[in-house]
Curated annotation (Swiss-Prot):
Entry annotated with the keyword Endoplasmic reticulum: yes
Upper lineage: Eukaryota, Fungi, Dikarya, Ascomycota, Saccharomycotina
Keywords: Endoplasmic reticulum, Membrane, Transmembrane, Transmembrane helix
Localization (cell): Endoplasmic reticulum; Membrane
Domain of life, per lineage: Eukaryota
The name this protein goes by in its record: Uncharacterized protein YKL065W-A
Membrane-protein topology: Single-pass membrane protein
Parts forming coiled coils: none
Length: 73
């Protein structure tokens, strides 16, 4: 991080400072950013879908009923 700032200052000291010099380096490539968003959304959706399928599964509801009946006794 510090070396990036030093390089930036060395680069900008020779000429007029423009707003492009202070743009973030990470995420500047739109294709990379889109692929990261896709991977992130898939990484979040898979566990959520697995949880929903498990929760709505008939075996899970039977186990839940048995557990609730035992809890009442």
């Amino acid at each position: 991080m510090r070396s990036n700032i030093l390089k930036l200052l060395q680069r900008t000291s020779r000429r007029y400072v423009s707003s492009k010099d202070f743009e973030p380096v990470i995420g500047s490539n739109p294709k990379k950013q889109t692929s990261r968003l896709m991977v992130g959304s898939v990484g979040v959706m898979i566990p959520v879908l697995l949880y929903l399928f498990y929760k709505n599964d008939s075996k899970h509801s039977e186990i839940k009923k048995i557990y609730q009946n035992e809890k009442k006794i």
